[in-house]
Amino acid sequence: MTARIRVAVVYGGRSSEHAISCVSAGSILRNLDPQRFEVVPVGITPEGSWVLTDGRPETLAITDGALPGVSGSSGTELALAADPGRRGQLLSLGDAAGDVLAAVDVVFPVLHGPYGEDGTIQGLLELAGVPYVGAGVLASAAGMDKEFTKKLLTAAGLPVGDHVVLRPREATVSLEDRERLGLPVFVKPSRGGSSIGVSRVTAWDALPAAIELARRHDPKVIVEAAIPGRELECGVLEFPDGHLEASTVGEIRVAGVRGREDGFYDFETKYLDDGAELDVPAKVDDAIAEAVRGLAIRAFDAIDCQGLARVDFFLTDAGPVINEINTMPGFTTISMYPRMWAASGIDYPTLLATMVETAIARGTGLR
């Protein structure tokens, strides 16, 4: 009998998306094929401690509006051996400090936001010589930072929306830029996700408060012109032989749903109040769907991505415009990425297996 592949599912983390990472991990733990994979669940506390947990999916769900999390009491504290000669070893930091608690073949970093999705854990895993699911250091960092995502997409000749970046030394948007952007605008942490810290601004006198909110999560802020149009999404998946495929296109509809006339897909709408309708496949012409799929793969290549990504679009009268790239999209039960692949004929367990197998085939180092 072939030995099962040992997969460390790493979740939680130090970012404001800690809870959503836990929910994604719970869904993944339910769907990894136990006949093929031996799961080693590793939680990261909001303070940054790594712990070996029991990995029970039911503890990683949103229950009656309460968000899950990882604490120091969730399990045994551990560290990843950074020496490639001890590749994949998880070492105890408890009473038996230095003992090997587990050794893994591959890491699935189900981490959203800074200190996980931004190239940091990817760099650690490269140093340790441990294969991992998803994008490498460069693509993870570029995909996390909306400023550099847009720069790379623009350099590749891909359509992006108008925007202004506010660095920590810059207090507000200039009058010239305000005139160009118009209203409304969306004010966001440049390196964040799950709509945390995001505001829709319809009057310029509300801009300072929106910038202050965004800067609670990131000192660098991006202010984006609103783009009228439908919200479409498309998944990209790399296979073990290196070829790429784009998924069925999906659509998120918020305006008019549960009173959300502003059409703002915020954190509560995404995760807590069922305030959006998800159409998979999207009700668009075949030509539009094919254009979106093609742009998704071009965007994936533009940031030198690997493994997987979800590319978000606005469908305007002039055609699709790329909003963001998510190099570790959500894997919750309502997340679009697995739903779009299911509609494309790849069920959840097969999708996860493909990602793990691709990570192992790719390995680490320059490639």
Curated annotation (Swiss-Prot):
Domain ATP-grasp per the UniProt entry, residue ranges: 150-357
Main location: cytoplasm
EC nos: 6.3.2.4
Residues engaged in binding Mg(2+) 2: E324, N326
One Gene Ontology cellular component annotation held by this UniProt entry: cytosol
Entry note: cofactor: Binds 2 magnesium or manganese ions per subunit.
Single GO MF descriptor: ATP binding
Disulfide bonds: none
Residues at which Mg(2+) 1 binds: D312, E324
Pfam families: Dala_Dala_lig_C, Dala_Dala_lig_N
GO biological process terms, semicolon-separated: cell wall organization; peptidoglycan biosynthetic process; regulation of cell shape
Keyword match Magnesium: yes
Record flagged with keyword Magnesium: yes
Cofactor(s) in the UniProt record: Mg(2+); Mn(2+)
Entry keyword set: ATP-binding, Cell shape, Cell wall biogenesis/degradation, Cytoplasm, Ligase, Magnesium, Manganese, Metal-binding, Nucleotide-binding, Peptidoglycan synthesis
Task performed by this protein: Cell wall formation.
Family listed: Belongs to the D-alanine--D-alanine ligase family.
Identification of the protein by name: D-alanine--D-alanine ligase
Organism this protein belongs to: Mycolicibacterium vanbaalenii (strain DSM 7251 / JCM 13017 / BCRC 16820 / KCTC 9966 / NRRL B-24157 / PYR-1)
Name of encoding gene: ddl
